[in-house]
Amino acid sequence: MNFNGANIPLGEDSRLEIAPVNSVVSAALYGDIDEVYTDLIVKGTGTPLTYQNLAALWPYLQPTIGGRIFGNADAPLQWVSNNGDVITVRAAAVTKMPDLILGVEKPGIGPVEFSGVVGNGLDPSASNSYYTIATGQAFSAPAVAASSIPRQKYMAAWGSAAGFSSFQAQDAWTITHELKLNPVKIQGRTVDMKITSYRAMAKCMPAEPTMANIDAALLAQGAAAEHGAKLSSTAADLVITGAQTVSVTVKNAALKTAGFVFGGKALRNGEIGFVSTINTSSGTATAALALA
């Protein structure tokens, strides 16, 4: 896969879906009698293999709310096969950033979703206004360094809360994204999308913190848990660092959820969840997530 010049090797099979959106034509006497072609968004999904091309795969970590993700210049997305088949989506953008699964036994990176709209200044009735299909094209296999595949041990640190200064997940950390997009339509056809919100979440089953540590840090009961208290009142950066590469920081992270497990095999701690909070005190919104 190649997106706007970034070569992205994939760890699994990828998909490209072309599904036109139609509006049903109905008549009182005859029921649904036809359909009218109204819109098309080309959807592409794939699972990146390597922790590279950070700006291309995770472009909205500190977004401008109301910003257009397709913009005025088309960013091409290509599927390039070793048999010479090439499909090029003319105007593409990331619409679902990959989750991160940080651990030794996990793949490291989840699926990314791209969406394609009609090219700038083009009418859908024009040939190749959304995508092109070619065969017999030259293929060059990408170089993949094992060091860029992020399977390794990770340690975490969260503020000054007791038990959280240095801890690890029992299995793996999962970093997810709450990205909200609003389509921009002209006469029913999607021509762009605008960012309306973004937050980052992180969850794991921690090994080291005690039940008392987790209870004290969670805004659930006690002096800090006054009715109406803001999560940001207990927030601090959550920094997750790999033994060789990869650093993930959930900015101004607040502990939002927690649980405990009881049984003969399980460790006591269940899953805990952090969410980013956005500091706007300077007049500029801080980033929700930082990757390095």
Positions of PLM-derived features:
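Signature of extracytoplasmic/envelope-associated structural regions
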Residues: 1-292
